[in-house]
């Protein structure tokens, strides 16, 4: 899951890189590990027991702040964590993730459907029964026609996950080829009299219910325009509705007047009366504003140089929570210099994952990552090819130190030494600090390297589009739901590479038949035990890292800063701070 900028061709002028500032920042950061470790220990209590709704805390305005907006309001297109987590209190799908704290939040539960169906026909057929009496925020009843239209709309609007999540539906192949004429004929059948929706698959999908729980499969009215609605809100089913949006300044939500709670674990009634999201406040200023109570929550990553202050003075307002997320360097395997595997391996050897940990805030909230699967997920990476003394044929158990000599040797062997390389980063404090270090590293191993910071609002779609000829970039990714497929298949699956598109999350343009075969078997073979499935993902992980289309850097926890007045801090494993359940009065 990544920031989804508004579509635009206006890219800021590259900023000048100052190596001295990078070194000074790293020197400062060396003092942080003990502080952040203490912060993690102090600020991470055990999840609270979920309690019945407490009407005394109903009301008030929840005030959120971010440096930039998150792009389109279209829930079937937006792929930013910033808005996906917000949309969780606005929209609903047939299924959802359980709205409880702790590991149980990874469980799928029925949402607009009455119950979870048992797959039939060897995992090829799912029959859902729609709940009665649910209305959209415009008063319109939710019908089976809305469900069918919403599933077709995933393909018609070019949802970023249309291919990776929903291509198993019968008829999806034609929809992916010609979205405008998508019908999903034979794939989606409705029976209005029985309130049932039947979905047929061409192959089993062991994670299909999880994919239906993801935001891109939410149910919207059948007459919703079949294109990106941009800044125009779509009627919704959840406890809140989107009311006003200016991407430069504000996003406003208020209560959905037609919402009546049907399941507290699927979509609980909310506490705040309104939610106000303010944009244009830089991350440094946002920290101060939340500390002072001007806002209740900041969406941006907390700058490294403020973590010590939070650990010393604001521990009650600072919350460290696990989240399957990583920083990484995708390298374009189709253009020089990284169309050479040795050049890509050189980057993996040369990068100091310890430095990246420090730039993010220290070992209390981040850890080196050698492969594609963070430690909180099944089939977590358990090897390290690219550390001093190791190789793809003689792996280590964990990362120890960079090997610059090996990296320089590989650059020379690749014949790419001296080539110009431009690193694209977002212009946030953390990304700029990391990016500055990576630029210096690229220079050190033999390239003419420069850094090009781009607005955080634009960077993610920019690096996805092959027309921009991005060689290497620094970006982040977090799980849409708890599965290794979210990192291996999403980021490197052949079906997720779409040249000349802003929606091509396979940024390296990597496609390997052997890797894809392993991933497809892990996703579709319902006869496998969990252990056997994990083994397939681990095999894919090792094959991927031997080819090095990506240099994983760190896995990171989430550090959440809230105001002193915010009560009932409610964190779910999938949607993080769950906005409807916090108290502001």
Language model: regions and residue ranges:
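N-terminal lobe/hinge region of extracytoplasmic solute-binding protein
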Residues: 47, 65-121, 235
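Extracytoplasmic/peripheral linker and loop segments enriched in polar/acidic and small residues
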Residues: 48-50, 55, 188-190, 357-360, ...
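Alpha-helical secondary-structure segments
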Residues: 63, 143-152, 194-200, 204, ...
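Gly/Pro-rich hinge or "lid" segments in bacterial periplasmic/extracellular proteins
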Residues: 98-103, 184, 200, 204-270, ...
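Surface-exposed binding/hinge segments that line
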Residues: 129, 148, 156-221, 244-246
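Extracellular/periplasmic solute-recognition and catalytic clefts
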Residues: 168, 243-254, 276-335, 358-359
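Structural transition elements
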Residues: 240, 364-410, 430-433, 528
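Long beta-strand-rich cores associated with HINT superfamily self-processing modules
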Residues: 560-585
């Amino acid at each position: 899951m990544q920031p989804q900028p508004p579509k635009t061709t206006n890219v800021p002028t590259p900023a000048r890189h100052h190596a001295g500032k990078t070194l000074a920042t790293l020197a400062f950061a060396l003092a942080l590990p003990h502080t952040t470790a203490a912060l993690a220990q102090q600020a991470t209590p055990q999840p609270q027991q979920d309690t019945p709704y407490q009407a005394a805390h109903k009301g008030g305005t929840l005030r959120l702040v971010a440096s930039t907006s998150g792009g389109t309001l279209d829930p079937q297109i937006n792929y930013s964590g910033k808005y996906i987590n917000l949309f969780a209190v606005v929209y609903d799908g047939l299924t959802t993730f359980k709205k409880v704290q702790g590991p149980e939040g990874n469980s799928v539960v029925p949402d607009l459907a009455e119950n979870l169906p048992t797959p039939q026909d060897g995992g090829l057929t799912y029959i859902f029964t729609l709940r009665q009496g649910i209305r959209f925020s415009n008063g319109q009843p939710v019908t089976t026609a809305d469900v069918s239209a919403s599933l077709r709309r995933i393909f018609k609007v070019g949802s970023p996950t249309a291919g990776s999540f929903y291509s198993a539906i019968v008829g999806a192949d034609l929809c992916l080829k010609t979205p405008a004429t998508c019908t999903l004929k034979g794939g989606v059948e409705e029976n209005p009299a029985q309130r049932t929706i039947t979905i047929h698959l061409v192959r089993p999908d062991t994670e299909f219910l999880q994919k239906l729980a993801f935001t891109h499969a939410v149910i919207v009215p059948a007459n919703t325009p079949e294109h990106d609605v941009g800044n125009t809100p779509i009627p919704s089913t959840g406890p809140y509705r989107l009311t006003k949006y200016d991407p430069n300044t504000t996003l406003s939500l208020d209560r959905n007047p037609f919402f009546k709670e049907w399941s507290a674990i699927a979509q609980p009634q909310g506490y705040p009366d309104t939610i106000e999201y303010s944009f244009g406040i830089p991350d440094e200023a946002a920290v101060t504003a939340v500390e002072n109570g001007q806002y209740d929550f900041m969406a941006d990553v907390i700058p490294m140089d403020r973590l010590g202050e939070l650990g010393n003075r604001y521990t009650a307002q600072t919350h460290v929570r696990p989240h399957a997320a990583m920083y990484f360097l995708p390298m374009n395997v189709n253009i020089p210099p990284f169309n050479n595997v040795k050049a890509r391996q050189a980057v993996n050897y040369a990068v100091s994952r310890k430095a990246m940990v420090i730039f993010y805030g220290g070992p209390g909230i981040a850890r080196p990552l050698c492969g594609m699967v963070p430690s909180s997920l099944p089939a977590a990476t358990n090897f390290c090819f690219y550390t001093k003394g190791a190789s793809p044929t003689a792996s280590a158990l964990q990362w120890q130190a960079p090997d610059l000599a090996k990296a320089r040797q590989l650059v020379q062997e690749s014949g790419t030494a001296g080539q110009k390389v431009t690193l694209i980063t977002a212009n946030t404090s953390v990304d700029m600090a990391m990016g500055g270090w990576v630029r210096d590293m690229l220079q050190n191993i033999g390239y003419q390297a420069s850094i090009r910071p781009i607005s955080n609002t634009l960077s993610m779609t920019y690096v996805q589009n092959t027309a921009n000829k991005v060689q290497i970039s620094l970006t982040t990714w977090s799980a849409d739901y708890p599965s290794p497929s979210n990192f291996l298949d999403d980021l490197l699956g052949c079906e997720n590479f779409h040249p000349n598109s802003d929606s091509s999350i396979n940024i390296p343009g990597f496609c390997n038949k052997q890797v894809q075969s392993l991933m497809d078997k892990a996703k579709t073979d319902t006869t496998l035990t969990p252990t056997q499935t994990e083994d397939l993902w681990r095999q894919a992980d090792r094959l991927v890292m031997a080819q090095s289309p990506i240099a994983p850097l760190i896995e990171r926890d989430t550090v959440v800063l809230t105001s002193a007045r915010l009560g009932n801090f409610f964190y779910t494993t999938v949607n993080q701070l769950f906005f409807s359940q916090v108290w502001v009065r």
